Regions:
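Short, well-ordered junction/capping motifs at the entry into regular secondary structure
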Residues: 1-2, 188
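A penicillin-recognizing enzyme superfamily signal
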Residues: 5-55, 64, 70-78, 89, ...
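Second-shell loop/turn segments in exported
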Residues: 37-40, 75-83, 128-133, 141-143, ...
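Active-site SXXK
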Residues: 58-59, 82-111, 145, 201-205, ...
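Proteins synthesized as precursors that undergo proteolytic processing into mature forms
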Residues: 71-72, 83, 98, 104-105, ...
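Conserved catalytic neighborhood of penicillin-recognizing serine enzymes
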Residues: 102-167, 211, 221-253
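Mid-domain, small-residue-enriched loop/turn segments at the edges of structured enzyme/sensor domains
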Residues: 122-129, 161-200, 209, 213-216
Length: 380
């Protein structure tokens, strides 16, 4: 922190002790996951990574990695790298929709739409994005759209429900400070972000709408134990508890039965959790950012040179999620963290609805399912 600069010149004379929150065992657990992943990714590429884990409730940094340990440099990718987040940005679109009172049962057509963007020459060109698996379909709920990370649903959301400016405003309210371009392609996470910012921002969902600024040093002492400076936790409410919970619940669907499902069936992580996979257009970035009620963490893998791909099939759920799973599983076990559930606020209710119509059941209803709603948009 810049506040330390005035004391820096006296470091040697006064033998200052910086008391940090970093947990050595947490860093060791992440490094183990990092090394394991490098062996699986393409060895001929200089694959880099960034990782950061925060206390969900306070923003205290538990562990951080700014690059691969066998190729040291002074560039901390966790705090300095600007990378496209891909689908990791989609929760901000859904947050904007929920904040505008759209229920998660809102249905949009899972069919191609055209966008316009500037090409490398600065010229406007037509662009028709698709879902990562090339699939299309019929009417699709917002929940299914995020669960399956459907690009076409995200694009239709910014064209039909929440315009790019509203999505940008939500991201900024949730403390994303890097420039966000308020254009239709915001739906696919094309504006660069810093890993530390998006991880801290995600913790807001799990912390009932309260954003906590990341903090690495709690206080500075001299050799006699006298406190020279203390750093306090900095928090503010940026979302309502209801909006935060609804997005949390959507992100739980992602890891329970969506694109992050391997967290459960393959890596056996059993704590209540939410998260999102992310992959950029040419597979140059692979992300997984997620949280439990106690720890929020994010993993990024990529090449420093933006144009170089990680290789075929290296999606966020394949390249980044395994390291996240290894760290979170070990951290929760080693720290004996209980399987706390996300608290449902008073303004959110669970309602039984018709599985086909997504409305209240009638005498023609064949199948039922339960869904969460804000009290203000429960089906009538």
């Amino acid at each position: 922190p810049h506040e330390c600069s005035s004391a820096a010149s006296d470091v040697y004379k006064r033998q200052l002790a910086y008391l940090s929150i970093f947990d050595a065992d947490s860093v060791k657990m992440m490094l183990e996951g990092q090394v394991e992943l490098y062996e699986e990714l393409r060895k001929e590429l200089l694959v880099q990574c960034a990782f950061i884990a925060l206390d969900t409730k306070t923003g205290e940094i538990l562990a951080m990695i700014g690059g691969r340990s066998d190729y040291p440099d002074e560039f901390n990718r966790a705090t300095q790298a600007l990378r496209q987040p891909g689908s990791v940005f989609k929760p901000y679109i859904y947050t904007a929709a929920i904040d505008n009172n759209y229920p998660v049962t809102t249905q949009l057509l899972n069919q191609p739409v055209a966008l316009y963007r500037n090409n490398a020459k600065g010229e406007r060109e037509k662009w028709t994005p698709g879902n990562y698996d090339k699939s299309t379909g019929g009417l699709t709920t917002l929940r299914e759209g995020l669960q399956k990370s459907l690009n076409l649903i995200s694009v239709r959301m910014v064209q039909e429900l929440v315009p790019p400016r509203q999505v940008k405003d939500i991201a900024q309210r949730m403390q994303i400070t890097t420039p966000i371009r308020a254009v239709d392609s915001i739906a696919l996470g094309t504006s660069e972000v810093k890993p530390i910012e998006i991880v801290a921002s995600y913790s807001t969902f799990a912390n009932k709408g309260i954003y906590s600024s990341p903090i690495a040093i709690t206080r500075i002492e001299d050799k006699y134990g006298r406190i020279i400076k203390e750093y306090s936790i900095d928090q503010k409410e940026v979302l309502s508890p209801e909006t935060a919970y609804m997005v949390t619940n959507l992100l739980q669907s992602v890891v329970d039965s969506g694109t992050g499902g391997s967290l459960r069936w393959k890596y056996k992580f059993r704590h209540p959790a939410g998260g999102k996979t992310g992959t950029t257009q040419n597979l140059s970035d692979a992300w997984f950012v997620g949280f439990t009620p106690n720890i929020t963490a994010g993993v990024w893998y990529g090449i420093d040179e933006y144009s170089v791909s990680l290789g075929d099939g290296q999606y966020g759920g394949v390249a980044a999620l395994p390291a996240w799973a290894l760290f979170m599983k070990n951290a929760h076990n080693e720290l004996n963290i209980s399987k706390d559930k996300f608290e449902v606020p008073d303004g959110v209710v669970e309602v039984e609805i018709d599985s086909d119509t997504k409305q209240l059941p009638t005498n023609r209803t064949k199948n039922l399912e339960k869904e969460y709603f804000l009290r203000s948009n429960v089906p009538q």
